[in-house]
UniProtKB/Swiss-Prot annotation:
Region of interest (E1 fusion peptide loop), residue spans: 893-910
S-palmitoyl cysteine lipid sites: C721, C741, C742, C1242
Family from the record: Belongs to the alphavirus structural polyprotein family.
Protein name: Structural polyprotein
Transmembrane parts of this sequence: 693-713, 764-784, 796-816, 1225-1245
Protein source organism: Chikungunya virus (strain S27-African prototype)
Amino acid sequence: MEFIPTQTFYNRRYQPRPWTPRPTIQVIRPRPRPQRQAGQLAQLISAVNKLTMRAVPQQKPRRNRKNKKQKQKQQAPQNNTNQKKQPPKKKPAQKKKKPGRRERMCMKIENDCIFEVKHEGKVTGYACLVGDKVMKPAHVKGTIDNADLAKLAFKRSSKYDLECAQIPVHMKSDASKFTHEKPEGYYNWHHGAVQYSGGRFTIPTGAGKPGDSGRPIFDNKGRVVAIVLGGANEGARTALSVVTWNKDIVTKITPEGAEEWSLAIPVMCLLANTTFPCSQPPCIPCCYEKEPEETLRMLEDNVMRPGYYQLLQASLTCSPHRQRRSTKDNFNVYKATRPYLAHCPDCGEGHSCHSPVALERIRNEATDGTLKIQVSLQIGIGTDDSHDWTKLRYMDNHIPADAGRAGLFVRTSAPCTITGTMGHFILARCPKGETLTVGFTDSRKISHSCTHPFHHDPPVIGREKFHSRPQHGKELPCSTYVQSNAATAEEIEVHMPPDTPDRTLLSQQSGNVKITVNGRTVRYKCNCGGSNEGLITTDKVINNCKVDQCHAAVTNHKKWQYNSPLVPRNAELGDRKGKIHIPFPLANVTCMVPKARNPTVTYGKNQVIMLLYPDHPTLLSYRSMGEEPNYQEEWVTHKKEVVLTVPTEGLEVTWGNNEPYKYWPQLSANGTAHGHPHEIILYYYELYPTMTVVVVSVASFILLSMVGMAVGMCMCARRRCITPYELTPGATVPFLLSLICCIRTAKAATYQEAAVYLWNEQQPLFWLQALIPLAALIVLCNCLRLLPCCCKTLAFLAVMSIGAHTVSAYEHVTVIPNTVGVPYKTLVNRPGYSPMVLEMELLSVTLEPTLSLDYITCEYKTVIPSPYVKCCGTAECKDKNLPDYSCKVFTGVYPFMWGGAYCFCDAENTQLSEAHVEKSESCKTEFASAYRAHTASASAKLRVLYQGNNITVTAYANGDHAVTVKDAKFIVGPMSSAWTPFDNKIVVYKGDVYNMDYPPFGAGRPGQFGDIQSRTPESKDVYANTQLVLQRPAAGTVHVPYSQAPSGFKYWLKERGASLQHTAPFGCQIATNPVRAMNCAVGNMPISIDIPDAAFTRVVDAPSLTDMSCEVPACTHSSDFGGVAIIKYAVSKKGKCAVHSMTNAVTIREAEIEVEGNSQLQISFSTALASAEFRVQVCSTQVHCAAECHPPKDHIVNYPASHTTLGVQDISATAMSWVQKITGGVGLVVAVAALILIVVLCVSFSRH
């Protein structure tokens, strides 16, 4: 692009420095001639000086003199010491002190419209005055460093990450203008040039940094084109995340991996009412190894602060120096935790126990079938808190012990494959089963295991139930637990373990009790006549007491333990807790799935016969692409042959994970519409059996009725003639009457007797008498055929020749069917100009509804903290604002001196159980969104053949939005049908959309869709209704039993059925991001076209065709351009002519041809008519074409028809000819019989 001189901003001229990285040709204005001559004179003087002053050394450029002086000044310190100083080394980095042209230009503008945003005295970003608004990135914390702007009320938009407010009136003159014009090229910002290409802004890597958020990007006229929010490092260049404008509509461009460029604000933590940066604890250094208990207390005090994990990392790293990170650092947090013993319902021998490998949680959200199991032991860590892949540590009688990881096993109905381990977590792929067992073998070769009831049925990915990943196939989206040990967003709660009872610490010594601590901290209590309790770290003797009267427990507050519902919490510390990250996060990935063998397909009349060969259970589904989809599906497990009927609108069949197959029927038939009557009847019977039977039956009935009527009239006339002679004795019948009525002239013998006589005596006369009436009838029929037609031809179907719209001006309106992939031609006839043909084809049509998100729902997680056991007293519940929170106190649970409850008193012991619901960790990837769908907006991608060029444009089909094709303006829509496949309520799950009447927000029902609701996957507002009821724990067991409805989300996933992608009518293709329906073949699409005068060719300039004739040598109807027509012509001059069919039942492939001399042209056409008669217009001349089309041989094709599909087939000319002959012959017989009857009646009446 061309740069405008910078005098626009400075009101003065100066020579800009060339921009070397971009080889853009700049338009340099010529200077006045005197300046050019002065420059040449200066060059000449310089050259003479160089030649004459040889003794003087050549001078270096001025900018290097300073460097030379600096080097001379630095020689002294460099000679005094051998160590190189750092300031000279940093000089090259600070070399660019003078800003370049672009930087100076931006600084001049920024002085007025840019303001710093400060937080605690530090600049975190910038605010910009643009138009009538002051704009600041929403992620930039702090206030604007301006008294007037700081007190404004900003409106926040999280979608665009922007805050806006109205500019005070007295500051509007300082604001910059903005523009949506962004031609590709280079723009300017504070750090130099910004390249805009492919819809993205990029800069050289290193030119921007955190703290630049909010800086504007200017064009060369000083207008703001975008505001910087952040950047994504892409190697040599950095892609900018910006907010920009597109035709007054704000848009946000965010490249993948973009980070916000606000200056980081140090997160503060608290210690003894003193705040400090979380990454720098005040104890120098605050090391867990040195002060473990105090460090954990500090972490518990700051567990809810944003910088908790920074404090945790700093507290566990003793060295103040920066260390190289490794995979071992991810295990570093486990040195502050320990394994534990917990209750297990089945320890492998049919009874419960306190197991070192107790199962806490089994997660199966991954769609690839991987299980994530949480246990009480820790894997990958030794008892010395070091990282070791080959070991695991478990609690052996309250003391951590090591075991080999090789002895770890997981099984359901068969052994599982362990794919990953770290800390408390195991990843495994397991076969189907109803129970899950985890166990290990310790160093003493003793096996420990724990079994839980768990129904495991690996989900199906795709549409085939396969057992192992194929080598080749198809990639489908799925989710899995990533085998990464790095810190994730998922976390678990830990807390201080309770005191652990240990009777081995007590021993009886001659009436006294000795407590041996063995280097540990022990809490004791003895009831020996009085209360005797305390906390000791050395051995102690209790006088006059017995072991049964004392209780001793080991106290260890130097390590955390998982907050398990199977272990009581520490009574002294209450709700104090910590958090640690856990490995193996759930993530969306792609999985390789097999593709079923292609079926063997045989085509029949309006049907497809598919022979299927499934290697494993494979899903077959199909739907009609008409208004009623009639979706059907079935799982095929063995070789099977299926016969599917193909409707007129088409059939879509999906077999396994293959792409859908689409079929359309053709009007194929065994007979022909141009043969004998029986062939014609067979032809129409195969096409329209019901109507053909009805028509043939009615016609047969009418013909038979007419024949019967003629026979009846003849019999009536004969009787009228015979009666007078029969009543007269000896009467003789006239010869003519006896000949017509087939009676004897005399009454001596009957007709039968005469016939027998002639047969016996004169057989030639018998045959002559029999042939005379037949010969007379044939002669009369042939004579009447030469007469004018007695009856008009009965047209069974009238095909209207509508043609194209004719306009008197350059504005043209047409309506095309909303069918993708079928070209449509329209003819523009303008008086005085040669006709113009426009060809249009819909490449895609999109219906995008306006959505408003009600909530998202996902699988819930039941959080059960460790139960609180109140020894010798009663606990009380407190109200907590948590989703579906429940709290109960149970009395009479634990007996006197029961060790599991850690109580030692003879009074009542109580347990406080509490539970609540929160979103599962999988909700970030596995969730369904409930939307309300409103009016859908339609857009069409249109291919237009205009003036010999194919041009593709995209327009909103609203009847208002105009797009330009060269010099013509097209306005598309509005569509004739406001139909949309989406209901008022829809649910979106990954790439699928479902019409569903979901419950509103805050009204979810247990066990159904929406039992847990949240506004967004990240929001903290959660509503839950899971029917959570706490139950009374069994005596002698530490646990929190409860009853709860199953997850409504998981139930919905199993029962949701087919999505709209498979069940939508009219062949709609449903897509998401955004939600839209594409290529729905419903309704029509009106198009208004404004064509300028220059696009037309005057009649005098266009070729004129004469002597045109049309011949159709071959035609196959209902086939894709199966007809060929040859048009002969004579033309006055060479040129191009538009070709168009004036009948909408015939579609011509060619739109424009070149004519020259006396020649002929060949065109291809498509029609659904058996007898096609149409007119073809070439330039301004029309010619009549007639074709006798035969049915296609192919029953089924994989493309839609390119012509207008008729609801009922036409009657061929041959069929109409046979109808005329048959009806004419029968009508003649009736007419002759009627004439005879009339004559006989007249004669009869005249006698009387």
